[in-house]
Amino acid sequence: MRQGRARFITGFLFAPVLLYVVYVLVPYGQAFYFSLTDTTGFSPEHNFVGFTNYLELFSDEVYLRAIGHNVVILTLFPIFTILIALFFAFMLNIGGRGDKAGIRGVRGSSVYKFVFFFPQVLSIAIVAVIWRRVYQGNEGGMLNAILIELGLVDREKPLAFLGETDSVIGKLTFGEFLLDAPVALICLIIVAIWGSVGFYLVLFSAAMQSIPKDIFEAATLDGANRVQTFFRVTLPLLREHVSIAWVYLGIAALDFYALVVGLTPGVGGPNHATEVMSSWMLTNSFRPDRFDAFAYACAMGVSIAIITLLLAAVQLRITRSREKLEF
């Protein structure tokens, strides 16, 4: 009986594991191997150069700046997305008026969830078209038009949101490492938050609906207000869901390639204002001025994979609950 069950499980696992090995692990192995060579990506002939490409990453000013941009995204994007999603999920599920029937959500909450979730079903290309119209650097842009009508911006000098290279936090240097947050990069983060809040709102909302209403009613009877109920009751019970969301958003923050290409002029924006690790990797893949550009890009790809794995491990370690709360 056990042998038959083992064969059954093995048979079902064989195909997906084989596909994972062929299409995920093997390409990673090839990328690591090519990163140790001077391959052009087009010729089978190449020489072994060791970790030369990896050492060069530490002197690549654009790549180091791109890492800084990913750090800014990693700091702002997950935090604001989770906070906004948690706030609206709480208000939609427990933000209604309490009555004899107990704690209720906001009337028409399903409609609000649909509205919030709608950006999630749009492709990145459509999102880019919409927000390029919003950020357009003349009075025809939606945001500029509003600011001009309010008298906050001169009609003759509209703001070029996606072309602004000035940093909102100045420029912080740590040796060769540069940390800055150009206005154009902040604009991309806002777009990413807008597109992601809906999904996590639905995720947190579903988790809140699984919490018995008796718990919230008991907190209300004990004199807890909505703020105390959220921080002392709701949030601890959603700890695992927030941890998962944090990991997914952290991984997404290390990518951002589609938004960079879709929204900013050129790959990486003006003066590399929106350059991220993935966009600089793609730019270096087929540089005509460097014969081993493909090998150098492979080194970037491997470094991004390592950073992503370390980040996911650290986030899971930090946010993992030591004891599981049950209800």
Region locations from a protein language model:
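A structural signal for multi-pass alpha-helical bundles of membrane permease subunits
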Residues: 2-327
